[in-house]
Design a protein with these regions (language model features):
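Structural motif
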Residues: 9-13, 53-57, 96-101
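Residue position within the beta-strands of beta-propeller blades
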Residues: 2-4, 46-47, 90
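Beta-rich, blade/repeat-based domains predominating
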Residues: 28-44, 73-87, 117-135
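Short loop/turn segments that connect beta-strands within the blades of beta-propeller domains
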Residues: 6-8, 41, 51, 84-85, ...
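A short beta-strand motif characteristic of beta-propeller blades
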Residues: 20-27, 64-71, 107-114
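Conserved N-terminal segment of EGF-like repeats
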Residues: 135-145
Length: 145
């Protein structure tokens, strides 16, 4: 499991699901790290920092830390992030919007939904394979308990 902590110093950590093997991945250059998202395809951990106005990533073991997006790209207060396919999506509470861009290259930033949200925070993409289709819904509705 992975988590972020806004303490002094702010950090991003990981541990086994039973709490053992705790390890600090990042504890420098962070202030309000949040919105952790794992890209299983590339084995990367992404996060937003709402104070530094950046979206960064590293490998899931903490190596190879890189900045993907900054205030120079229009980020004002990124908070929640999620990964879907080749895209990263994030909420920005200062802009009251949801944005997307390519998860490896800071280009083609698009507004997905904008200007009518009030303090958007968390966001989660749901893989199409995990969504309920009509056949799955029919199966569930026919179950007897």
């Amino acid at each position: 499991m992975y988590w972020s902590d806004w303490g002094e110093p702010a950090m991003i950590e990981r541990a086994s699901m039973d709490g053992s093997a705790r390890m600090v991945l990042h504890n420098t250059g962070l202030t309000w790290p949040n919105g952790l998202a794992i890209d299983y395809q590339l084995q990367r951990l992404y996060w937003a920092d709402a104070f530094t106005d950046r979206i960064e990533y590293s490998s899931v073991d903490g190596t190879g830390r890189e900045i993907l997006l900054t205030s120079a790209h229009g980020l004002q207060h990124p908070f929640g992030i999620t990964i879907s396919g080749d895209q990263i999506y994030w909420t920005d509470s200062a802009n009251s919007s949801i944005y997307t861009a390519h998860k490896q290259v800071a280009s083609s930033i698009l507004t997905v939904y904008g200007d009518s949200l009030i303090l958007p925070s968390g966001i989660e993409a749901v893989d199409p394979d995990r969504q309920l289709t009509n056949s799955k819904l029919n199966f569930l509705m026919n179950l007897t308990f």
